[in-house]
A protein has these predicted regions:
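Short Gly/Thr-rich strand-loop-strand
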Residues: 130-168
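Mid-length scaffold segments of soluble, non-membrane domains
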Residues: 93-139, 145
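Bacterial N-terminal signal peptides that target proteins for export
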Residues: 1-10
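Bacterial signal peptide processing site
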Residues: 23-26
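Early exported N-terminus immediately downstream of N-terminal targeting peptides
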Residues: 36-91, 97-100
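Extracytoplasmic/secreted envelope proteins and their assembly/folding machinery
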Residues: 39, 43-46, 120, 130, ...
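C-terminal motif of bacterial Sec signal peptides marking the signal peptidase cleavage site
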Residues: 17-21
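A short, solvent-exposed beta-edge/loop patch
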Residues: 112-113, 122-124, 155-193
Length: 193
């Protein structure tokens, strides 16, 4: 019986030491810095920055944890997962000129119809690849401008007003849509938070 009590006391002491070891010295009760490094939900940020009509018509795509492309909103619900992955990999990513290894994280939305200039993207560049991302998105804008210049005047004006900016938070954003100034302001506010 005495041996059981000693054993129980040793277990209780070990548990107490384990709990004390879980604390951090100098803890202030404030969130740790890992909370500040929590990844941002770029898909949700794009969704919230644009109009309800755009959310209805244009999907927002990104790369899933499994390495395959995935999408939400717009017409994405009409696709099977493999079809969606193939369309994004073979059509949309080449339109944005984003290659593997350029982005640590991203979300984007594009029109693949040749009668509309529409492209939004938030890209967190991979280490040392910021200028590559800026160049890729600027090439997208230039392509849109060339496509629309002698075709559809209203869409050409949208492409001419497109913006590619590197934000203080490190993300590179592309805004090529109607009311681009408002969308850009919305993106900047959300990404600064």
């Amino acid at each position: 019986m005495k041996l059981k009590r000693i054993f129980a006391a040793l277990l209780a002491g070990a548990a107490l030491l384990a709990l004390v070891g879980c604390g951090t010295s100098g803890s202030t009760g404030k969130p740790s810095s890992s909370a500040a490094s929590t990844p941002k939900d770029y898909t949700q940020i794009l969704h919230d920055a644009r109009s309800a009509e755009d959310n209805e018509y244009y999907m927002i795509f990104t790369k899933g944890a499994d390495g395959k492309y995935t999408a939400q909103y717009g017409y994405s619900k009409d696709y099977e997962a493999d079809q969606l992955n193939d369309e994004i990999a073979n059509m949309m990513m080449p339109m944005l000129n984003l290659e593997d290894g350029m982005a640590e994280d991203f979300a984007a939305s594009l029109s693949t119809m040749m009668v509309q200039s529409y492209g939004l993207a938030i890209v967190k560049p991979a280490e040392g690849r910021t200028q590559d991302v800026v160049d890729a998105l600027n090439a997208y804008v230039e392509s849109e401008q060339q496509s629309m210049e002698h075709y559809l005047e209203d869409q050409y004006q949208i492409a001419k007003n497109a913006k590619v900016e590197t934000l203080p938070s490190g993300e590179v954003v592309l805004v090529c849509c109607e009311d681009s100034d408002t969308v850009l302001v919305n993106l900047k506010k959300a990404l600064a938070a």
